[in-house]
Amino acid sequence: MKILVSNDDGYQAQGIIELAQSLAQEHEVIVVAPSENKSAASSSLTLDKPLRPIQISNNVYCIDATPSDCVHLALCGFLNEEIDLVVTGINFGANLGDDVIYSGTVAGAIEGRFLGLPSLSISLASWRGQHFKTAGIVIRQLINQISHAHLSYGTVLNINVPDVIFSDIKGFQTTRLGKRHMSEQSVIDKNDSSLYWIGENGKEADNGVGTDFHAITNHYVSITPLQTDLTKYNEINTVSTWLNQIITT
């Protein structure tokens, strides 16, 4: 297959280098990634200026842009290639539970799905970042399986891999997203009290059996099918009822 690879940590990050090298053993890989770290960029697109792809080497490009920009331009712009699959990562750090709303890595995969391609995002679920090779093996195995399967249109697979050697992986689990508590308070900059840093993620709130949190804690690879339809269907009638009351009073 011909695979487009991107991320949100930047084209020089260890994770994307490991991902590209791992996939290149069996597939043709084209890397189009941000020129620098764009973590937590979510699905933002750059609309206020033009973007310039820069070729770094054969089949490796960087852009001063978000992950979604990179995937969008690669599929709708400068690449004259027929891409079969989009894979984003390997992210440095987990994308579990509510993280997926903010993640540029997940957003890059979602952009690929918006543009009609099967897409996967993969993250190494630790800030130690010691076992990217494990994640590389995992994604290669999954792609070999997916090539014989069918993902319904609009589905993105969000994959999180424990930061352990491959022989310590207990297996694969299909999971749902867990939930976090509210984020921690913003932090005042040590050198300038007029500046603030965004606070850390909230602690795990829903991490029971069946969640992505639970799988990772127990050394399983977590695979969560995602969709982009954010409609809360069971609230439609409730909202309609009080809207009707507003209209009639």
UniProtKB/Swiss-Prot annotation:
GO terms for molecular function: 3'-nucleotidase activity; 5'-nucleotidase activity; exopolyphosphatase activity; metal ion binding; nucleotide binding. It is found in: Cytoplasm. InterPro entries: SurE, SurE-like_Pase/nucleotidase, SurE-like_sf. A divalent metal cation binds at residues 8-9, 39, 91. Its EC number is 3.1.3.5. The keyword Ubl conjugation does not apply. GO terms for cellular component: cytoplasm. It is an enzyme of class 3 (hydrolase). Its main location: cytoplasm. It catalyses: a ribonucleoside 5'-phosphate + H2O = a ribonucleoside + phosphate. Pfam families: SurE (PF01975). Keywords: Cytoplasm, Hydrolase, Metal-binding, Nucleotide-binding. Its cofactor is a divalent metal cation. Binds 1 divalent metal cation per subunit. Nucleotidase that shows phosphatase activity on nucleoside 5'-monophosphates. Belongs to the SurE nucleotidase family. This is 5'-nucleotidase SurE. It comes from Vesicomyosocius okutanii subsp. Calyptogena okutanii (strain HA). The gene is surE.
